[in-house]
Each structure stands twice: as C-alpha cells, then as structure tokens.
C-alpha cells in the first residue's frame, strides 16, 4: 500500500453499508475497528475489533481514535448534524489523517442541496468537518463518496422505476432522465482503493468528494428491462418532479415524514440540482477504475429483486 493508512475505525460497521466496507478493508489488509454504542448487541464482521462507548462522549471517542489513521462513518440515514459533531470533534482532535463523513448520496455539492431535508445535515456535517480541520491546523484531511441511489436497495422498494410488489412503474418528468446508481460493493471497493493509495488516489482524493456510479440508468429503461425479465407489464404512473417536491414540502412542514423519499426525486431530477444533469461529468469512475455494469448485470439485479418480491 502506498498510503499512510493502516488502521481504520468505522462508525456504523454492522449496517449493510458498514459491514461491506469493513469486509473489503479487511481483505485489503487494513486493521479495522468498529466503533459501537455502549448498549449495542450487534455482532461485528469477523476479524473486526470492537470498541463500545458513548457516541456522544468526545473524550472517549478521542481516546478510541488514538492510533487510527482513518475514520469512516457509515451511519445510516437520516443523518442528524448534532449526532455527527462528537465523532468529528474527536477524529480531528486525535489527528486522524483521513476522515470520511457519511454522505453516499447524489449531488451534495449543489448549492440547492441544503434546501432538501433528506441531505441538509449531510451538507452541514461536511461543512462542520472542514471548519474543524481548518481550526485545528493539523494534518487531518477529509474525503467523501457520493454514489446516487444504491442499486440493490432502490430496486427492492421500487424507487427507480419498476416496483415489483405493486407491478407499477413511476416515471418522473417522463422517465427518460439518466441517473447514476451504485452497488454497495463498488462503494466499498472505491474507499479501499483510495485508502490503499493506488495510482496516487490517496493524495488526489484529499479534501474532495468522489462521485461514482455502477450504472447510468433511467426509470423507463429499468422498467423495460423489468418487463423483459419477468414477462409481465407494469402499470406506468407519471409524476412531475416539481409537483412532487412542493407536495412533499407541505406535508413535511406538517410533520409528515413519510414523504422523505420524495425529496430525493428533486435531488435526482430537479432542475439545477445537478443530479441527472451532471453526474457523468463529475464521475471519478475512470480514476478509481470502476467499470459500469453490462445490461446483463443490470437485468440480473432486476431478476433478483423480482424474485425477492415474489413476482417470479
């Protein structure tokens, strides 16, 4: 490995995202430690060390981060800024070389992103992290990974075109706009490659957000593929993204959190948000050596989702 990273602490190491990152880092030869809540009963992946503590205790976290070269947050959504501050403060205080906040979203760098409840605290957490690194003046740096909707997860609940349980398909603004979607394993491997320092990636990714995608797909494309692999037709439902967004804002203001996902459609397809508009231009795929999925691989993913839903 041609980077200074050897020891890595992970917050959220037992979740779907965190466990994949942990396993990939272990396979890459890193020493991995899971930072868990004091009362956690979840089992960490084999080979991962566990430290249980109060995640709001900056002093305890700082001690836990001593000797760690990188800290990665794989905390699940929703991200709440106040819950991020203690570990960020501790990581910077401990002089951790590379700090990776939990983003894993679409275009968090868009000036409009902070207006969306679904990512506002991710935007603010990154800003807070940068401020702390600047204030401290040590050698800490940050990076983040943004990957669009997770391929396996979004197919499971019908968030990107076909819904295998209801046999419906949602098209937003016509359903033809491409968006980047990424396999969890590709996110994990990208992080590992950067921290290994392959091809100078460790330095190149310093203080940057890395945008990647396993596939560039549209809702209409996925629906047609779903019809092919299932042999069944999906009832198409058309939605105007701006109308969905305004409706979500009104309901969210009344305390309805069920509209949470509707804000993500604005992030993906809304004008000026840089989701479908700019993800390919921002892509780090070539730099990190990430090959996009073939049609067959996408169809295999759709087939698996259909089987899990009991459609085939």
Range-by-range predicted roles:
Residues 66-101, 121-131:
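NAD(P)-cofactor binding segment of oxidoreductase domains
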Residues 9, 51, 100:
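Conserved Rossmann-like nucleotide-binding pocket used by diverse enzymes
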Residues 1-3, 311-312:
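Universal eukaryotic N-terminal targeting presequences
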């Amino acid at each position: 490995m041609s980077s200074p990273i050897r020891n890595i602490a992970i917050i959220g190491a037992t979740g779907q995202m965190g466990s994949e990152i942990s396993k990939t880092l272990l396979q890459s030869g890193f020493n991995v430690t899971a930072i868990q809540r004091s009362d956690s009963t979840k089992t960490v992946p084999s080979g991962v060390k566990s430290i249980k503590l109060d995640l709001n205790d900056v002093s305890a976290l700082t001690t836990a981060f001593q000797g760690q070269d990188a800290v990665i947050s794989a905390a699940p959504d929703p991200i709440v800024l106040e819950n991020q501050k203690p570990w960020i403060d501790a990581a910077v205080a401990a002089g951790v070389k590379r700090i990776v906040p939990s983003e894993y979203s679409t275009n968090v760098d868009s000036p409009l992103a902070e207006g969306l409840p679904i990512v506002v605290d991710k935007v603010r957490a990154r800003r807070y992290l940068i401020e702390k690194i600047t204030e401290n003046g040590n050698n800490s740096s940050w990076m983040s990974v943004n990957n669009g909707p997770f391929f396996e997860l979004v197919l499971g609940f019908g968030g990107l075109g076909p819904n295998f349980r209801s046999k419906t398909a949602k098209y937003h603004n016509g359903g033809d706009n491409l968006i980047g979607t990424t396999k969890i394993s590709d996110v994990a491997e990208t992080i590992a490659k950067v921290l290994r320092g392959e091809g100078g990636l460790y330095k190149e990714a310093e203080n940057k957000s890395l945008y990647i995608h396993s596939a560039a797909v549209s809702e209409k494309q996925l629906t047609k593929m779903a019809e092919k692999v299932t042999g069944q037709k999906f009832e198409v439902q058309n939605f105007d993204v701006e109308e969905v967004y305004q409706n979500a804002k009104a309901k969210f203001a009344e305390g309805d959190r069920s509209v949470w996902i509707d804000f993500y459609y604005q992030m993906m397809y809304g004008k000026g948000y840089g989701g479908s508009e700019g993800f390919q231009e921002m892509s780090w795929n070539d730099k990190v050596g990430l090959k996009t999925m073939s049609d067959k691989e996408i169809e295999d993913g759709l087939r698996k989702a259909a089987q899990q839903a009991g459609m085939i």
